[in-house]
């Protein structure tokens, strides 16, 4: 359901809903449009006083600077495009004097576009493992079955909405054709990033966990035993997200549906498979 002149701005809602219920749901989502983002600039990031990713690098370790790899023309253009995008949203900063330096890795996605990552192998080796417990996937899925109405939520570039500790930022420096940069936010590929994300979500939804929401890192499902309760359940979750400035990605969210994909399983009111 498109909600704006811009066709990129839309909500995915239950196809089987009666017209009047569907329209009421759209109006409800429009009233809460501030918790969604269609561009990274619209995601201000979570307050670092609430959550911040720390590397905890062993101070006795000698920093490693990798020599620059030779990139193909296509890969070079992909990296430059990624740098431009990340600079625009304030996710990276140019660095001149550094001790750690890593290379970029460019891989082709299924849609034919390029994914640019940073090879943090050396850095990750000297970071201790964060033992924060992740939920059991089978238990989460089983607990979702049996609910007539569900909404599946996904944050907009959720990892980038988590700040990286100031003392650790320069350790994430990487080489590009247009200079060296470091991350200001938690990047994919950093050790313990998943644990930090889960810690944030567990802390954020502490009062709701086990009730009307299930969370596994960046996958969320809001579930209601009664259809009449679902709007109220969503309202509560939206208020928490709004309070922490965590923005959602509408293209990966679906609202008030009877079934959906959760952690690789198709979940319905009757079963998961």
Regions found by a protein language model. Name each.
Residues 2-273:
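Retroelement reverse transcriptase polymerase core
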């Amino acid at each position: 359901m498109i909600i704006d002149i811009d066709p990129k701005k839309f909500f995915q809602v239950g196809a089987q809903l009666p017209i009047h219920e569907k329209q009421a749901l759209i109006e409800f989502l429009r009233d809460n449009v501030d918790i969604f983002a269609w561009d990274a600039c619209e995601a201000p990031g979570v307050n670092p006083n609430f959550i911040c990713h720390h590397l905890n690098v062993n101070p006795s370790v000698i920093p490693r600077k990798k020599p620059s790899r030779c990139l193909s023309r296509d890969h070079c253009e992909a990296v430059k495009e990624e740098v431009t995008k990340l600079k625009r949203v304030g996710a990276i900063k140019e660095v001149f004097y550094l001790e750690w330096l890593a290379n970029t890795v460019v891989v082709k996605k299924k849609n034919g576009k390029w994914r640019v990552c940073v090879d943090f192998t050396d850095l990750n080796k000297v970071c201790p493992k964060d033992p924060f417990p992740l939920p059991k996937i089978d238990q989460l899925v089983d607990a979702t079955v049996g609910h007539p109405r569900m909404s599946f939520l996904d944050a907009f570039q959720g990892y980038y909405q988590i700040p990286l500790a100031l003392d650790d930022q320069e350790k994430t420096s990487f080489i590009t054709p247009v200079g060296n940069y470091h991350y200001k936010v938690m990047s994919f590929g950093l050790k313990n990033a998943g644990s930090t994300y889960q810690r944030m979500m567990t802390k954020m939804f502490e009062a709701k966990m086990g009730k009307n929401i299930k969370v596994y890192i960046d996958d969320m499902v809001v579930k209601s035993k009664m259809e009449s309760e679902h709007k109220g359940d969503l309202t509560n979750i939206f208020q928490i997200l709004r309070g922490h400035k965590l923005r959602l990605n509408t293209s990966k969210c679906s609202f008030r549906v009877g079934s959906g994909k959760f952690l690789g399983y198709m979940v319905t009111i009757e079963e998961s498979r």
